[in-house]
From Swiss-Prot:
It comes from Mus musculus (Mouse). The gene is Kif27. This is Kinesin-like protein KIF27. The keyword ATP-binding applies. The lineage of its organism: Eukaryota, Metazoa, Chordata, Craniata, Vertebrata. The keyword Nucleotide-binding applies. ATP binds at residues 84-91. Interacts with STK36.
């Protein structure tokens, strides 16, 4: 198997609304066109996939998950899990939230993968797929089944199968058939999952969730299926795990207390174990060391995904906010380590697939044979139900035939031997003619017999044909039908190919036409755009020409009049002073030019005029850029929107004094000058009106864009909700229709049974009448007897008792008959009830279909509405682009406007000083507002700087704590290294001493006599051993000092974690220092500017020569600042409240959808239960119909008694099983007890078996081998310990010494513990012999070992089965037979006994 690394993807979520409102900085960003990511200033990480803040769900799925789905279909296991801190977008990415409240474009990985899987299934019709789904939650280190909430946590266990794969025992796996079924189960599990609200996340996942899709694939072989032959096909079972991990949490940030705090502890411990596993697998130096999978349950579940046999993708979700810098850095480090983990993917093909297929085919054939055999037996039993003696005779004849066949086989064997012997004898011995003739006749007769034996008898052949006839006819009939269907299919395929060709041709034509239409539409749009621009320019030019010509005509008419009237002393001038904007123009131009209405004026003035000012165009472009930025980011965050009312008020304030100045200036100059001034002012006024209309146009476009986008989101939510409800309604309608079919079927069965029981009702009525008549006659006789005076009192009393008994019996009979009659009437009324229920269900289905039609109509309406909104949004975007284009073109247009503007300025500077004064006042006002804004921004910067300083202090304190821990560990490491070095020096000194002693001893050995040489050599060997040991110690100490391994592995791991934490905190401190430095620099610059501006303010105020104004201005200035700051805070709170309201609305929508889903789910479960009830009713009705007149009450009572009896047996066998399991825990005691049993048996029987016992043992061995083969052919089998034990009792039952008549009557099937003990005591008191009872061999009494009474075979794996010896088998069967019943031979034994 090839090793491949797991794929790691990183996704950066956009800033949240709260983060944008509080001006959080972005500390994580991706590098475009690369797979790299930068955190802080210079920390770069490289991953397999990187997704920025603008990435979509579709992009993430197509890049990372789609290859995993294809691998799943190929037969590989796949896993995707999301990792990251809380609130980083893991659940959103995986798709584990509320499915119904999510629009189509925001669906996560799980819904998209489900659709892809079922699409792949539909594309492979030659493979039979079975899809199963499970949903498990790890909450507080406990497993919880989200699809079956009633399952106890103690029933869920993590185990490993035979292949080493991790499985969850006890989890519910639901088989699904469609996407709707899977989505419904996913929604049920998501609704049951633990979530909570913290300070960091409104919908924080409080548990780890694992959604598993199992795909079982079986290849089809149509040709082999046609011939009815066995065929081999591959079994592929693959799984896809979608893991949504809970996020790591900081208690200081989340603010969790109480239960949430306990959850945080469990979540962090599980994620710490996962991080340790990733570190151990990702570190190449620790690959051979232990991997701590068992530290947490989530790591045990992910064992196959991390370092196992699955294809894995890890999606790390990070937050770009600067407040989460350290968490994001740690997540990226873990993700970088995970890239070093290597898995070994393997195809999940079942190794026993061929064997299983062969067994399934054999089982199918055996079932068919069994059905045909049962049919023949049922026919024979119906035909011979009254001929029981004939059946016994048939059985006896069959036994005789079997014996005769055995004798015949023996005779054939003898004849064969004699034939061979006579052939040899004929060649070896000379015979006379007569003997040769007889021998030849015997040979010929033998040959004839052989031919007759080889040729089958016609009777046997007929029997074989009878047995194989129905199957053969069925196969032939099926083959004919199959050929007919194949011919029809071939004809249909020809037709379909023709239609496909026609369809392809039509599609190509449609595509060509669509392309042509698109080309025409593009050219049409371009032509319309050019035409519109030309029309607008023409209209503007025409309006300008009309205005100028009207003005010239007006001035030419007003020249002969007096100068006084023309300069503004008349009534028209006064009217123009009062209404300078529109009244003079309308009064003078009304007869010459067309004044458009408001709507027409809006259409005409929609574009920016050519003669706009540069500064106004600059402001216009700035607003356009702000609007486009807002439109790009409005799907992600809500931006702060500051009103421009002050600017509008300022512009209005500037316009009013200018108007006044113009109105006053009319009376100071002669007519010609007045005409020039009026003309220039008119152009300026029209210019301002056009500019005002442009701003209003932009604001209205912005507002309409926001409203349309909000409507679009609402429409998408409504569409998604309606689609979800339609899917649910479709499932409910289908289930209710199935229930109606079952009700109709039950009604038909009830009608047939009611017709059968109607006859019974009439019969019961007749019997009841007869019983009543007998009762009245008995009463009359009793009354007559009482009225008579009998002399014999005893006889009278006796007769009275007899009559009373008859009366009681008659009453009971009448009551029983009435009850039977009532039961029959109830059964007859069952069909009417079913009809009523069916009609109610049909009405309900009609109502659901009506709801479905309404939803479809609503879907169409919402779809049209969505299309309209999309078109409006596109139109608005096009208008915005046009306005920006015109604004950009207006910068360099028409220098005449600049000359005109310069002329106006020069004109205002020279003759009209009042206009300049008002303009200065407006400029001062603007300047004052700018100074206020500067101070506000400076205060805001100061607040942010204080927050950054506090955060830096917290990080520094945390770093100091980590440094203290690190210093302690380093000191300990230093002390340990010093101790090791001293130990090394001591060992080296001791080695030197030993070398000296060895050299001395070697000299002594050379010079010493032979007697002392032995002692000296022993001393030398001891010194050498000591030197070797010291050498090894010194080598180990040197190695530890060389590699620096002076601490324990746990302490080294802790030191490594501390170093990483300190590094992350240093990076965070560095980032904070940079941000603080930049803020301080900006504050210094702002302080300098502010001091200069304050000096300017003081100079200007001093120039006013009014001392009181200074104090007033300062008060006003502070008051304005405080008010603006309060306004800013209120706006911030308002927007936060709006976001909370929006989130609450989303929660309400999710809860409403969940409630609707649960209501439909409850209806679905109720329908399923009703369907199961109807199926049981059909079974009961069929049973009653087959019984042909038996009482319902009696049958139900028999069933209840049988159930009670079975419950008693089940309790007894469970208790026996528990006792045996307790005994099996002590293998030594069991071995000793078994040895004693064997000793007693050998002592009792002297170790010799008679021939009869040998025959019995051989038969039992055959029976045991068949039992073992049966067990080995199946995987595991449970023994039916209630009914099978009663039906298959062997003939070796224990009969007491008094004979079979003295057997005790049993009140229950299973003996009690007291009976077992008494039997055990009797068994120990009697010797084991075969001569105590005169009964035949099949009823020989055998003795039982008490502790083995009532043994229940334990469910074992095939690897634990073994073959039982003959002696052991005999003893076990004897022990089981002594209890009065037979049990399957138990093959359980301790491993130590093997």
């Amino acid at each position: 198997m090839e090793e491949i690394p797991i794929k790691v993807a990183v996704r950066i979520r956009p800033l949240l609304c709260k983060e944008v409102l509080h001006n959080h900085q972005v500390c994580v960003r991706d590098i475009p066109n690369t797979q790299q990511i930068i955190i802080g200033r210079d920390r770069v990480f490289t991953f397999d996939f990187v997704f920025g803040k603008n990435s979509t769900q579709d992009e993430v799925y197509n890049t990372c998950i789609k290859p995993l789905v294809l691998s799943l279909i190929e037969g590989y296991n796949a896993t995707v899990f999301a990792y990251g801190q809380t609130g980083s977008g893991k659940t959103y990415t995986i798709g584990g939230g509320h499915v119904a409240s999510v629009v189509e474009g925001q669906k996560g990985i799980i819904p998209r993968a489900i659709q892809e899987i079922f699409q792949s299934i539909s594309e492979n019709p030659s493979i039979d797929f079975k899809i199963k789904v499970s949903y498990i939650e790890v909450y507080k280190e406990d497993l919880r089944d989200l699809l079956e909430l009633e399952t106890s946590m103690k029933d869920l266990h993590i185990r490993e199968d035979e292949k080493g794969n991790t499985v969850i025992v006890g989890a519910k796996e639901c088989q699904v058939e469609s996407v709707e079924d899977v989505m419904s189960l996913l929604q049920v599990g998501n609704a049951a999952r633990h979530t909570g609200t913290t300070q960091m996340n409104e919908h924080s996942s409080r548990s780890h969730a694992i959604f598993t899709i199992s795909v079982c694939q079986v290849e089809k072989n149509a040709e082999a299926a046609e011939n009815g032959e066995w065929y081999s096909h591959r079994h592929i079972v693959s799984k896809f795990h979608f893991v949504d991990l809970a996020g790591s949490e900081r208690v200081t940030k989340t603010g969790n207390t109480g239960e949430r705090f306990k959850e945080s502890i469990q979540i962090n411990s599980g994620l710490l174990a996962l991080g340790n596993v990733i570190s151990a697998l990702g570190d190449p130096r620790r690959k051979s060391s232990h991997i701590p999978y068992r530290d947490a349950k989530i790591t045990r579940l992910l064992k196959d995904s991390l370092g196992g046999s699955a294809k894995t993708v890890m999606i790390t979700c990070v937050s770009p906010s600067s407040s989460d810098f350290d968490e994001s850095l740690n997540s990226l480090k873990y993700a970088n380590r995970a890239r070093n983990i290597r898995n070994k993917p393997a195809l999940n093909i079942s190794p026993q697939a061929d064997r299983m297929d062969e067994m399934e085919f054999e089982i199918k054939l055996l079932r068919e044979a069994l059905q045909s055999h049962q049919a023949s037996i049922s026919q024979a039993s119906q035909a011979s139900s009254e001929n029981v003696p004939d059946q016994n005779r048939i059985h006896s004849l069959e036994e005789q035939v079997a014996q005769l066949q055995e004798e015949c086989l023996g005779y054939q064997d003898c004849i064969e031997q004699a034939f061979a012997f006579l052939v040899d004898l004929k060649d070896a011995v000379k015979l006379n003619q007569k003997q040769q003739h007889k021998l030849q006749e015997w040979f010929s007769r033998t040959q004839e017999v052989r031919k007759a034996v080889l040729t089958p008898l016609p009777g046997n052949q007929g029997i074989g044909n009878l047995e194989e006839g129905p199957q053969h006819l069925t196969v032939l009939q099926l083959k004919r039908e199959l050929k007919k269907y194949q011919c029809a299919l071939a004809a249909d395929q020809v037709v379909f190919t023709q239609k496909d060709l026609e369809l392809e041709e039509l599609r190509t034509q449609v595509q060509l036409m669509m392309q042509e239409s698109k080309g025409h539409a593009v050219s049409l749009k371009e032509a319309q755009k050019v035409n519109r621009l030309q029309n607008e320019k023409i209209i503007e030019q025409q309006l300008l020409v009309d205005q100028l010509s009207a003005e010239l005509a007006k001035r030419s008419l007003s020249v002969p009049t007096s100068a006084k009237e023309s300069c503004g002393d008349g009534p028209d001038a006064r009217a123009s002073e009062k209404r300078p904007h529109t009244a003079p123009f309308e009064s003078h131009w009304g007869h010459y030019v067309y004044i458009p209405s408001r709507q027409d004026f809006k259409k005409v003035c929609s574009s920016t005029p050519v003669y706009s000012l540069d500064q106004v165009f600059a402001g216009f472009r700035t607003r356009s850029q702000m609007l486009m930025g807002h439109l790009e980011d409005q799907d992600e965050v809500l931006h702060c929107q500051f009103s421009d009312n002050s600017d509008d008020e300022d512009s209005e304030g500037q316009e009013k004094p200018r108007v006044r100045s113009r109105s006053h200036s009319w009376a100071k100059k002669p007519g010609s000058v007045c005409s020039l001034v009026e003309l220039s002012d008119t152009q300026a006024e029209s210019q301002r009106s056009y500019l005002g209309n442009g701003d209003l146009k932009m604001e209205s476009l912005q507002e309409s864009q926001e409203i349309n986008l909000q409507k679009l989101r609402t429409s998408e939510l409504i569409l998604n909700k309606a689609k979800q409800k339609m899917r649910e309604l479709t499932i409910n309608i289908r289930m209710k229709e199935d229930l109606i079919k079952e009700l109709i079927k039950t009604g038909n069965n009830a009608k047939s049974v009611s017709r059968q029981y109607s006859l019974k009702v009439t019969k019961l009525e007749h019997e009841a009448e007869q019983a009543k008549v007998e009762l009245t006659e008995t009463r009359k006789q009793l009354q007559e007897l009482e009225s008579k005076d009998l002399s014999d009192v005893a006889l009278k009393v006796k007769l009275q008792k007899e009559f009373r008994k008859k009366m009681d019996a008659a009453k009971m009979r009448v009551q029983v008959l009435q009850k039977k009659q009532q039961d029959s009437k109830k059964l007859a009324s069952l069909s009417i009830q079913n009809e009523k229920r069916a009609s109610e269900l049909e009405h309900n289905v009609d109502h659901l279909k009506y709801q479905k039609v309404q939803l479809q109509r609503r879907l169409r309406e919402e779809g049209e509405k969505k299309k309209q909104l999309d078109a409006e949004i596109k139109r608005d975007q096009q208008k915005i682009k046009e306005l920006q284009l015109k604004a950009g073109q207006g910068e360099g247009l028409n220098p005449k406007a600049e000359d005109q503007d310069g002329f106006n300025l020069n004109r205002r500077k020279s003759p009209f000083r009042s206009g300049d004064q008002f303009q200065k006042l407006d400029e001062q006002r603007k300047w004052l507002d700018e100074e206020v804004e500067k101070v506000l921004s400076q205060r805001q910067e100061l607040e942010m700087l204080e927050e950054d300083l506090k955060k830096r202090e917290a990080i520094v304190s945390k770093k100091e704590a980590l440094l203290q821990e690190k210093s302690l560990l380093e000191n300990k490491k230093l002390r340990s290294s010093q101790a090791l070095s001293t130990d090394g020096l001591k060992i080296s000194a001791r080695l030197n001493l030993l070398d000296q002693e060895l050299s001395e001893k070697s000299l002594q050995l050379e010079s010493s006599p032979t007697e002392e040489k032995m002692k000296i050599s022993e001393q030398v060997q001891a010194l050498q051993r000591e030197r070797d040991q010291l050498q090894r110690q010194r080598n180990s100490v040197d190695e530890r000092l060389k590699h620096g391994r002076v601490l324990s592995p746990k302490e080294e791991h802790l030191l490594f974690q501390l170093e990483e934490g300190i590094e992350a905190l240093e990076a965070a401190i560095e980032f904070k220092n940079e941000s603080i430095q930049s803020r301080q620099n900006s504050l210094k610059a702002s302080f300098q500017n502010l001091s200069q501006s304050e000096a300017n303010v003081l100079e200007k105020l001093v120039c006013l020569n009014i001392t009181e104004i200074r104090a007033i201005l300062f008060k006003y200035f502070n008051k304005v600042i405080n008010l603006r700051e309060t306004e800013r805070k209120q706006q911030l709170q308002n927007k936060e409240m709006k976001m909370k309201v929006l989130e609450r609305d989303n929660v309400v929508h999710e809860l409403e959808s969940a409630l609707e889903h649960l209501r439909l789910q409850c209806d679905r479960r109720l329908t399923l239960q009703q369907k199961e009830h109807e199926q049981k009713m059909q079974l009961l009705l069929q049973h009653f119909k087959d019984q042909d007149g038996d009482s319902i009450i009696e049958t139900l009572k028999n069933y209840e008694d049988k159930i009670q009896q079975l419950e008693k047996d089940l309790y007894f066998y469970k208790k026996t099983s528990r006792d045996l399991k307790k005994r099996l825990k002590d293998p030594a005691q069991g071995a000793a007890q078994w040895q004693r049993t064997l000793t007693e048996h050998h002592d009792a029987g002297d170790g010799v078996l008679n021939p009869e016992e040998t025959t019995v043992l051989s038969e039992e061995l055959k029976w045991a081998s068949r039992t073992e083969n049966t067990k080995l052919n199946g995987s595991e089998r449970e023994v039916d310990n209630s009914s099978s034990s009663l039906k298959t009792q062997p003939l070796t039952q224990q009969i007491p010494e008094d004979g079979p008549d003295s057997l005790p009557a049993r009140s229950s099937i299973a003996p009690s513990s007291g009976q077992l003990q008494s039997i055990a005591d009797k068994t120990e008191a009697r010797p084991f012999t075969h001569s105590q009872s005169p009964v035949p061999h099949q009823f020989q009494p055998v003795r039982s070992i008490g502790p083995l009474q009532g043994v229940k075979p334990v469910k074992l794996c095939r690897r634990e089965l073994r073959q039982i010896s003959a002696m052991e088998l005999s003893l076990r069967r004897c022990s089981l037979g002594a209890g009065g019943r037979s049990m399957t031979a138990d093959s359980l034994e301790d491993p130590e006994e093997n």
